[in-house]
């Protein structure tokens, strides 16, 4: 089980990303727009750099929803590989079967 503080940090990052998503998209559109003046695009770049670091979605880490494990997490299920294995053996994930060939 991951430390609760790390899980809460990720939750805080997710809220920050959600809060600044529209503003980041607006500034990025200004920066990418070639028809705008260089000064205007430069100002938009400075404003984008002034936003909090955690406002960038790239800083988010996928974690297991049960244990908080940061590695070996499957996006489809939102669970760590070890928990997927346990739950799948109990038959609680519909359509998931053990591979055999």
Swiss-Prot record:
Pfam families for this protein: Ribosomal_S14 (PF00253)
Gene Ontology molecular function, alphabetical: rRNA binding; structural constituent of ribosome
Gene3D superfamilies membership: 1.10.287.1480
Transferase in keyword set: no
Keyword Secreted attributed: no
GO BP terms, alphabetized: translation
Keywords annotated in UniProt: Ribonucleoprotein, Ribosomal protein, RNA-binding, rRNA-binding
NCBIfam families for this protein: PRK08881.1 (NF006477)
Oligomer and partners: Part of the 30S ribosomal subunit. Contacts proteins S3 and S10.
HAMAP family: Ribosomal_uS14_1
Name of the protein in its database record: Small ribosomal subunit protein uS14
């Amino acid at each position: 089980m991951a430390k609760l503080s790390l899980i809460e940090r990720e939750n805080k990052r997710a809220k920050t990303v959600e809060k600044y998503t529209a503003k980041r998209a607006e500034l990025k559109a200004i920066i990418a727009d070639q028809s705008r003046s260089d000064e205007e695009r430069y100002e938009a770049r400075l404003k984008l750099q002034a936003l909090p670091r955690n406002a960038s979605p790239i800083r988010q880490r996928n974690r297991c929803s049960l244990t908080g494990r940061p590695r070996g997490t499957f996006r489809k299920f939102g669970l760590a590989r070890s928990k997927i294995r346990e739950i799948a053996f109990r038959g609680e994930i519909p359509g998931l079967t053990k591979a055999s060939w």
